[in-house]
Amino acid sequence: MESRPALSPNWPAGELEGVWRWSPDPQRRREAALLLASADRDGAAGQGNWLAAQGWGPDPLAAVALKREALRRELEAGREKALPLWRTLLRRFPDQPASADALYALGRQRPEWRQELLRRFPAHPAALAAALEAGPGEAERRLGTLHLARWGPRWPGAGEAITALCSNRTLSPSSLAQLAQGLAEAGDGQGALRCLGDQGGEGPIGEALSDRGRLALGRTWLKGTPDAQAKASRTLLKVVERRPDGPEAEEAVRLLSERDSADVPALLRSLPPRWRNSAPVQARLALTESGVSSTLAVLRRWPQDPASWDLQWEAARRALLAGDWEGVVTILQTLPAEQLPPALAARHRFWLGYAQRELGQEEEAILTWKGLLVHHPGGYYGWRASARLGKEDLSPRGGPSGQALQASHSRWEPLASGERALDQLWRLGQPTEAWESWRVRRGGQPPTTSADLLVEGRLRQGVGDDWTGLSQLEKASLILPPERCGHLPRLERALHPLRFLDAFAPEAERHQLALPLLLGVTKQESRFTPAVQSSAGAVGLMQLMPETAAELAGGPLTLQRLRDPHLNVKLGAQYLSNLLDQWKGDPLAAVASYNAGPGAVQGWKTPDRARFPELWVEAIPYPETRLYVKKVLGNAWSYQRERTPAC
């Protein structure tokens, strides 16, 4: 049979409708119907026209069509009218993720089906919603909250429910330990500590923690106060001592090695020999020693370990700030860029070229930077290499319009997960179904490999969760193996989505700001999530402090108003434009001021910014601001125009 091009969201609606009406292949007609329904702008009624009678046959797509039709009927005719469709879906496809929604809907009348939902599809969003709604009795609510703590502690409303149940000290130690672990996995270290009780994890509740629970607590407490960090060290050390050969021990050792405290070297030297002689421990100890011999030994022994990659950069940064350019070259050449994840290889190549130029090796520097622009043309180091070579530069004012950016980002791209069913759902414009299938398959476990991070990050973007999705894509870029560089173009595009252009484009034009710079700031500030509020009180897309916003607006604003994307962007663009004016158009100082404040930037005793901009950035005394400047301006450079990396 003649092969036909696969249907996808890239097909024009008119052509899809032609397939839906006239194709002799019923499967192809159903695929067209799903695509048309996903893009239908006429609401539920239009979707019904496309999907009517598409629930035939044993193919899992029939389950999706039945679910969509049942949801449409609920919306149009009420829940009662949809019940026959839900029953049909559950009877014909009991093991398909779509049946979780059937159990949820049918469970409104028969609570035992809600329990069946929690048992069969524990990580499915429908199960998490059912767990949050569990009741009316206290026992049902307790079981629902414990389910959330185990399977979905980040589900909206789960944190409040878990915190409330933690106050019930009649629960068993194992139940309280599960609740504390859930809060830790959701990032609430203080709440987890309160849940553990007065003994803070040292008593019966702490003993009931699993190693995974201790890892979650340690990971969260390491981000807290010095006391919390010390508690994290004790908790992580217990993981290593209890099961030194267990799968959690390695991550515990890595987390212990990352803590920035004077007592860490002694603690690491007390570990069992297996871990004392591991890459993360030896890399951390090498940073405490004078000279570079220990550093070079670690790089040669463990070239593929992330701890070696971090060590190489920390040692090279110390050398470049000291002006030891021969030392920089030695450190960087010991572990070549070709062995690093592409995002780290870009940094490696830039500073190798910089050191070569400082040593008078002009031709070598030019070749190094040209190679960087071939393999890593986007991001901060792509910008700096381009500027150093006298090529294109970053434009803080002007630049491409919203329409031009939209045209370059408009095409749908395959998920390329390697799983046929998942890729098919994505291709047919069903990101929610794809995401739910992924959750069910993985049991809600967080991804750890670059491949899984890339897939889950894009799936989360597909369901509107840029906050977590972009974070996962960033992590994927930092551990992507060099041999998987073919994924880079897709990853780069996913890392730079276009959001809220109707808010950004007019303000960029009004203030003569580069739209890519506005997008770059916002991506780093909030990951395009309007509801975000920082621990310091910054609010909305561009993370404005209420006091700053009130000054810009000419009066106080409620938090609700400040979360409005259009108002937030209007005030944020005005503030950024003011900073650019204050710093005479210098994007480095303006962006640093957006993060740390112009007063702080004014007081830094750093290298001459005009002559040594890259050294000025590396000498910023605040690590957060140092990273922020590179991220924001790298984002802006990548948004300025599409830059396709090569393997």
Regions found by a protein language model. Name each.
Residues P12, A44-G46, A82, A192, ...:
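Single-residue signature of alpha-solenoid repeat helices
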